[in-house]
Amino acid sequence: MYKRQVENLGIQRRLIEETACIHVYPYGAITVGEQGEALSDLEGMAPGVVGFSDDGRGVQSDDLMRQAMLRAKALGKPIVAHCEVNSLLRGGYIHDGDYAKAHGHRGICSESEWGQIARDLQLVKETGCAYHVCHVSAKESVALIRKAKAEGLDVTCETGPHYLVMDDSDLQEDGRFKMNPPLRGKEDREALIHGILDGTIDMIATDHAPHSAEEKSRGLEKSAFGIVGIETAFPILYTCLVKPGILSLNKLLELLCVNSRRRFGLPLGTDYSIWDLNAAYAIDPKDFLSKGRATPFAGRQVSGKCIATICDGKLVYAAPETHTAK
């Protein structure tokens, strides 16, 4: 079982080396098959990963998470957690807020997120493990992480672009608006913005989760969870936060690029992208390079267009109108 984990990681790393045009840094699974039943071979995977995560599943067992943190601490790697208490989900699929109540939808309570964060922070106190929380969406989560940082715990966190610019008042009866964690209330969105401004939230990550058009065409209840974000993150955040003066451009770049490299010990290198900040356009999923095109931002007027991407000093992408520059 453990041998297969290390072999699979080796296959993944070879595929990255052979096919990726940008740098890709994998995580190792905390538990075998991300099933939450037995710890993975963390020691065997450690040389090839930047941390350990069960991706979109929360580790339900307190003891398993404690042991994972102790072993990750010894290896000098962070635990990267999707926080979710399964027993509190109760079949929900959007935030348990006003929209869910008004339209008869089953809701996901905020405690399903912050309850597991609270448990994990207690385990961080006990183990001294470096700990990173993925896609924070609830105001209570922000408050817990702020308190943990004030106590000196080695904790970082991220949120997603969609949680900063939308809330459950923006929901439509459309699978494009379904993601996990869900879009929460206005107070949650405001707490997240405060969190990026005061340094409680260290990063903004796209949480890019592409699905086919068919998988996202079944309405809020039956569509797959997930939102695409790689191609919309910067223009949406630049338009909604930087242009109105809520956030500086330098701060946005720290949140999107710099802080994650610092946290995970990644080299800065000669990787960068070139943007036309004055380019104004409507987001059209037909223009996406991603095969996943279900975005709640379709039709949104934004500013900021990627002109080119350079990795290791090499041009790996040029916008169609600049294609001849290749």
Predicted regions and their residues:
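Short, small-residue-biased leader/transition segments that mark boundaries at the very start
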Residues: 1-2
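Histidine/acidic residue-rich metal-binding segments in metalloenzymes
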Residues: 11, 38-204
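Alpha-helix termination/capping residues and helix-transition junctions
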Residues: 18-21, 46, 128, 198, ...
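Divalent metal-coordination and catalytic microenvironments
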Residues: 24, 52, 82, 131, ...
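Active-site beta->alpha loop and helix N-cap motifs at the rims of alpha/beta catalytic domains
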Residues: 28-35
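His/Asp/Glu-enriched, well-ordered alpha-helical/loop segment
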Residues: 102-130, 195-198, 202-204, 209-277
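C-terminal cap of metal-dependent C-N hydrolases
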Residues: 219-222, 270-326
